[in-house]
Amino acid sequence: MDFNPAANPDLPSAPCHGFGQACVCSQPAGKMNSRRLFTSLLGAAALSPVWAREGVEVGATSRMANLVPAEQVENAGAQQYQQMMREAAQSHALAPASHPQLQRLRAIARRIVPLAMPWNLRAQQWRWEVNLIASPQLNAFCMPGGKIAFYYGILEKLKLSDAEVATIMGHEVAHALREHARERMGKTAATRIGASVLSSVLGLGHLGDIALNMGGQLLSLTFSREDESEADLVGMELAARAGYDPAAGVSLWQKMGAMSKGAPPQWLSTHPAGPTRIRDIQASLPKVASLYARADKPAQRFDIAPALQKR
């Protein structure tokens, strides 16, 4: 059976992350001792000063993320991603390497991925993957560890330009780089063990078990609106540095608004409202305009390629 983009509406949904994680420190994944964990818990709500740099401004990663080892989250993401790809392949819903839309996605990713390293030192160790799933869903995601997937529906139904694809991909990659999943898992773990930790500061080996049990939640984990807004900004900068017009975020959200018509897709349920996102993107465009102006532009335009228009 051939790859059929319209034949698989009931495949497992991607994470409800946004159109979507990673610490700038290189802390080992081994067990924390009690005092270090206690200290981390007391300072968990505090954020480091804003990172002074050219481009968008975001706060540092929350220390809550440190309660769950990065390797554990990334391994869980890799396992779930591979399971999803196996299921898609068994359903003949995984695009072959020759598919024009997959080639397009991978070409755009080759421009964005090298720019990820300054945002997260762990990203250079990730085994990045990009795949296309035959499903009419309006969805895309990047799991912890750089595992990217787009659903055919979001490309076809929205008739995305290359810059709009780069905007979505940048947003999803930003969730991974900023460790939003790991942070939310850390907050959940802290809530579950908070009373016992604060009272005893002893014997917290079960934290690892809690994190492992929570690994299965990656597919259903939702990000906060603050996470989504941050991913919009970081994703816009990644796209601009990669040579894609950052103003594409405006046209993208206009398309999303027209498509949703009061019934937003599943992964938009926790997002800021479309008009709010458009205003925020427009307000931040001056911060990335010079980055886009200086960036090398893509030599190939896939959104005007005849082979792509036929698929």
Regions found by a protein language model. Give the residues of each.
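A Zn2+-metalloprotease active-site environment signal
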Residues: D2-R311
